[in-house]
Amino acid sequence: MVSHFMGSLSVLCFLLLLGFQFVCPQPSTQHRKVPQRMAAEGAPEDDGGGGAPGVWGAWGPWSACSRSCSGGVMEQTRPCLPRSYRLRGGQRPGAPARAFADHVVSAVRTSVPLHRSRDETPALAGTDASRQGPTVLRGSRHPQPQGLEVTGDRRSRTRGTIGPGKYGYGKAPYILPLQTDTAHTPQRLRRQKLSSRHSRSQGASSARHGYSSPAHQVPQHGPLYQSDSGPRSGLQAAEAPIYQLPLTHDQGYPAASSLFHSPETSNNHGVGTHGATQSFSQPARSTAISCIGAYRQYKLCNTNVCPESSRSIREVQCASYNNKPFMGRFYEWEPFAEVKGNRKCELNCQAMGYRFYVRQAEKVIDGTPCDQNGTAICVSGQCKSIGCDDYLGSDKVVDKCGVCGGDNTGCQVVSGVFKHALTSLGYHRVVEIPEGATKINITEMYKSNNYLALRSRSGRSIINGNWAIDRPGKYEGGGTMFTYKRPNEISSTAGESFLAEGPTNEILDVYMIHQQPNPGVHYEYVIMGTNAISPQVPPHRRPGEPFNGQMVTEGRSQEEGEQKGRNEEKEDLRGEAPEMFTSESAQTFPVRHPDRFSPHRPDNLVPPAPQPPRRSRDHNWKQLGTTECSTTCGKGSQYPIFRCVHRSTHEEAPESYCDSSMKPTPEEEPCNIFPCPAFWDIGEWSECSKTCGLGMQHRQVLCRQVYANRSLTVQPYRCQHLEKPETTSTCQLKICSEWQIRTDWTSCSVPCGVGQRTRDVKCVSNIGDVVDDEECNMKLRPNDIENCDMGPCAKSWFLTEWSERCSAECGAGVRTRSVVCMTNHVSSLPLEGCGNNRPAEATPCDNGPCTGKVEWFAGSWSQCSIECGSGTQQREVICVRKNADTFEVLDPSECSFLEKPPSQQSCHLKPCGAKWFSTEWSMCSKSCQGGFRVREVRCLSDDMTLSNLCDPQLKPEERESCNPQDCVPEVDENCKDKYYNCNVVVQARLCVYNYYKTACCASCTRVANRQTGFLGSR
């Protein structure tokens, strides 16, 4: 029975085995060949020799965007086809591929593994196999077989050794795995080897979906980096130097919300350059086909801003490794950006709360920004800039004409400097801004008491018109927005400026309100179109002088030009805008900068006029009116207008019918000689009387009247028809702040003996905001640190921590620590008082060979800035490179990846004790014949409180005599009045201003002497 059963079972097994052979045939030799070898065997022999020229096919469709917001990347490719393919009547370039039926057609190369090849073992980079010994795999307790050779496969799969000290110091502790990393088990490795033979043929199809999201693709940590410090006892992977961070690195946690959609509903996490398939691979021939040009191009997409609560794309990629053990334990990862430029597109992640980071992937997802604040993004592991056309690597920028990728030929730049020496006060025209101007920049060369003004051609004042000074800000005019800037009067030397993007929709005139010598006004704007011309030469320019860097020849005589310049030199913003071009002097001046534009001959030249008819005695010159008055009030000028008329009919005829030599010369005639209405001239506000809190500010308001192109100060009653502006106003620069103790005293820093305790003291404004300490009175600052006594300590050895730095920056050195025998109240004992078991004070260290390492070099500290109390010390910190026997000083940017030592520190010396403090001496009570001056003297302790511990013998005097000389007026030959109306300056009490004190020196000095004598007599 048993034998029968066993026989049946044998037959059944034989049938099953035979059926399995038919169902699952063994893979043939052809299937095990790599694609390159298959293509080589299937191609006929090439008798051509070199690479055959090809033709580009049409661009394929754009791939899906690699990001859903904040700027992703799309990819577009085109195939390189053999030239004979088009000649044989094959499919047009860009059509679906049928030319090579046995090959997979892909738009881009398949995705590359981020960490290791299929046969690569997780070896520690930088460690010899002979020295390594049994290597412990991360996340596994199974040692590596001794006979297994570690291979690199290719450069992108290996990691270079990172020497200790380059990114900091420290060790990553080895901890037993909390969870077995199944990705590195030997069984998993064997399965990968068995399946790797089919992976290449399936790679193209599997890569069509691009990068999978972190939820779908289990991320693997990058390899651990082990140093070359020699063999150790025990497990070789127990300790390994890794990327170390500076001590001051931020250890905050990122936001928990995700930037992307859930993996179940979206696959946009990594779809980018690796997400599409290649349009055409090379033909299955041994001869290569080459095409000249770009095979693929990238474009920016989905530039809409991500929600504020979303995490950055680097945070999302680093967080995907949170659920994978690293060296036996789990970490939370955050981006680490303090790397050099060529590594900005690697996925470097820092373990939160620890001072090391790991390169988790060689490439970030396409579309990831290279820098936190930069505009370049990463594509295929390379940092590429974004052109103005949104194409990556196009290097196109917007030229000065506003054209993307333009060559600056679509517009003209008009610029110059207004340097005319002005003599009279008031408005003077600087330049005309034509219609359609862009990139307008009108700037004083340096600060002065003059003001810039702007008016439209229609007569509307835009900025600083009608003798009123506007505050800096934005003003709309001419169809654009002008930014009026007036730099701070104390901290800046720059002058006023008008800035506008344009374009303007009407002609605008720029004026200067002249009050002191002209420092020069630079003007520049852009005119679109190649036939644009410059504005009319300003009236202050004489014929034959260079204008805007070009010598311009005017079409009128020098006398006429000078006379017209004198007539137009002074203009009032309240009146009608003078015409820039008249029928007699209309001209154009092409302005082109050297090396940027070439002068051209105008296309609209007027042909020669026909010969006029012969003059006769039937016509003569007659005055037919006058020109408009140059001003509406205050004495202007006008000229008679002469026309050619018929003697009998007095009808006007062409000027060619009259003898031009007999035409009378127009002479200037006065007009509108009545004075202009008086107006209030408003000055600028003075500085606020208080630096914080409510204060007062003042300004000067004068009644002025214009007559004969001069602005005169008149009695205030002439402006009584106008409401007088305010001369004083309240002001508040900022809110006053005070010191606030935010926390209680902390516990003592030592368990016994004398230590320190601290508390938080902040400068807080009256609305509760924390501000800089300079906002509060530093003399009233409460102490934030004090000593504390925790009782006596037992006699014992006291040790400090080992020094963080090795005595040698490279090579062999030592690290040291302090060892002292201490007892009650931290008093020192002889070293033998604690016994003979004294701990070691030095230990060896080695930072690797000296091969041009870059480091910070700090000099010695200077002496304390004060003799007692708290002060500061300084030292030099430079970036150097240590060679064999020399040091090379480098630019500080070369050491930017290293933590820079402080160049300043506080120092505390002995307390100063109570000392006498005094104020400055007051003004003398009399200017002559003996007066006195006083000051306050106080005795203050170290905390700036009143004290009675000062030596009375050392108390400074509180009163002393002054000005014992006789009251004889001293005559200063250089102190004179420059203006005849300085008595008005004295009456208006303007001598407090330096300008009027200098211009009216004699009058202001007499008033000052009278006031001093009056005070002294009292």
UniProtKB/Swiss-Prot annotation:
Interacts with FBN1. May interact with TGFB1. Residues 1-25 form the signal peptide. It is linked to Aortic aneurysm, familial thoracic 12: A form of thoracic aortic aneurysm, a disease characterized by permanent dilation of the thoracic aorta usually due to degenerative changes in the aortic wall. It is primarily associated with a characteristic histologic appearance known as 'medial necrosis' or 'Erdheim cystic medial necrosis' in which there is degeneration and fragmentation of elastic fibers, loss of smooth muscle cells, and an accumulation of basophilic ground substance. Changing G753D: In AAT12; uncertain significance; has no effect on assembly of FBN1-containing microfibrils. One of its GO terms (biological process) is elastic fiber assembly. One of its GO terms (cellular component) is collagen-containing extracellular matrix. The gene is THSD4. It comes from Homo sapiens (Human). It is found in: Secreted, Extracellular space, Extracellular matrix. Keywords: Aortic aneurysm, Extracellular matrix, Hydrolase, Repeat, Secreted, Signal. This is Thrombospondin type-1 domain-containing protein 4. Residues 53-307, 676-737, 739-792, 793-851, 852-911, 912-968 form the TSP type-1 domain. Promotes FBN1 matrix assembly. Attenuates TGFB signaling, possibly by accelerating the sequestration of large latent complexes of TGFB or active TGFB by FBN1 microfibril assembly, thereby negatively regulating the expression of TGFB regulatory targets, such as POSTN. Residues 556-577, 592-603 have a biased composition (Basic and acidic residues). Residues 187-200 have a biased composition (Basic residues). GO terms for molecular function: hydrolase activity.
